[in-house]
């Protein structure tokens, strides 16, 4: 498990993904670590969730989110929330070079399938303020 939630509060994570199986795995893994995890199946819900939370500490977006692709969602949310930590889950076969050209430079790419351990490490690192560089997330 990742380190306990620091300081004064709960860490809030929004997961934007339409794959129910993947979402269940991600939510279960992150909740085991004490995080509060919200889920959005579509772009509108993701934008509303991030905007309505007192604080959103991390957005994890998949390749496919109903209404727009994950890259589009990230670009849209980054415009209104420039400091929001964001991770991208890739499962669509696009090359790293292609994704890196479309994503902000501080958005790491976590390729599916991935283990609970890799997800935990990525989340812990990003929640602690140490953003991995863009491209593949390397432990």
What are the residue ranges of the model-derived segments?
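Hydrophobic/aromatic residues positioned on beta-strands within the core alpha/beta folds
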Residues: 89-91
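Non-catalytic signal-transmission and effector/linker regions of two-component phosphorelay proteins
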Residues: 1-27, 33, 75-79, 83, ...
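Conserved phosphotransfer microenvironments
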Residues: 56, 61-75, 93-96
């Amino acid at each position: 498990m990742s380190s306990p939630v620091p300081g004064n509060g709960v860490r809030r994570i929004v997961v934007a993904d339409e794959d129910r199986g993947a979402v269940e795995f991600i939510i279960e893994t992150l909740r085991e670590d004490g995080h509060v995890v919200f889920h959005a199946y579509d772009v509108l819900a993701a934008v509303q969730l991030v905007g309505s939370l007192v604080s959103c500490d991390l957005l994890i977006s998949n390749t496919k989110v109903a209404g727009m692709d994950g890259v589009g969602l990230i670009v849209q949310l980054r415009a209104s929330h420039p400091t929001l930590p964001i991770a991208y889950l890739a499962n669509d076969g696009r090359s790293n070079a292609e994704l890196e050209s479309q994503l902000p430079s501080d958005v790491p790419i976590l390729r599916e399938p991935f283990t609970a351990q890799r997800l935990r490490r990525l989340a812990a690192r990003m929640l602690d303020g140490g953003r991995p560089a863009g491209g593949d997330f390397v432990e």
